[in-house]
């Protein structure tokens, strides 16, 4: 059985993998795991507090919970009950300083890159990525 993959898909997959690797390298350079970076990055993107579900979407709950427990024990974050069984995650003051020196630096890099792109380029990139994701999810349902 011969396998065929469109050359553009190969390139796309390689680029996606290289982007993941670049974020992993950023986390390592900043002295943290990918899961810790995910938690801090998400908290930064929500202004220092968010629902636990905002962090766990797109990641393993077990991995996120391990990172949260570690960050909580270090005084970086704290969790509070919110509307029944939901939980909200907050950066402490120490956490805000830590996030500013770590995850926020990655956000600044992203902002610098996007600032170099025209509004049209940003819209095209986001729209096509969103469309690809939606189409891919639909096809996965058919598996």
Tell me the role of every PLM-derived stretch:
Residues 72-127:
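Charged, amphipathic alpha-helical coiled-coil/dimerization segments
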Residues 51-53, 69, 87:
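Residues within the helices of the helix-turn-helix
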Residues 41, 66, 127:
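DNA-binding alpha-helical recognition surfaces that contact promoter or target DNA
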Residues 63, 67-70:
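Residues within the DNA-recognition helix of helix-turn-helix
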Residues 1-30, 76:
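N-terminal leader segment of winged-helix/HTH proteins
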Residues 11, 18, 22, 38-42, ...:
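Pre-recognition alpha-helix immediately N-terminal to the DNA-recognition helix
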């Amino acid at each position: 059985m011969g396998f065929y993959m469109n050359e553009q898909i190969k390139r796309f997959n390689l680029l996606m993998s290289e982007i993941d690797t670049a974020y992993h390298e950023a986390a390592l350079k900043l002295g943290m795991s990918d899961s810790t970076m995910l938690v801090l990055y998400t908290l930064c993107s929500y202004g220092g507090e968010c629902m636990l579900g905002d962090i766990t979407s797109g990641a393993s709950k077990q991995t996120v919970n391990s990172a949260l427990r570690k960050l909580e024990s270090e005084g970086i974050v704290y969790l509070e009950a919110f509307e029944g069984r939901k939980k909200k995650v907050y950066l402490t003051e120490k956490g805000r300083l830590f996030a500013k020196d770590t995850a926020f630096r990655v956000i600044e890099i992203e902002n610098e890159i996007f600032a170099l792109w025209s509004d049209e380029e940003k819209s095209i990139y986001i729209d096509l990525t969103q469309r690809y994701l939606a189409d891919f999810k639909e096809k996965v349902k058919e598996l």
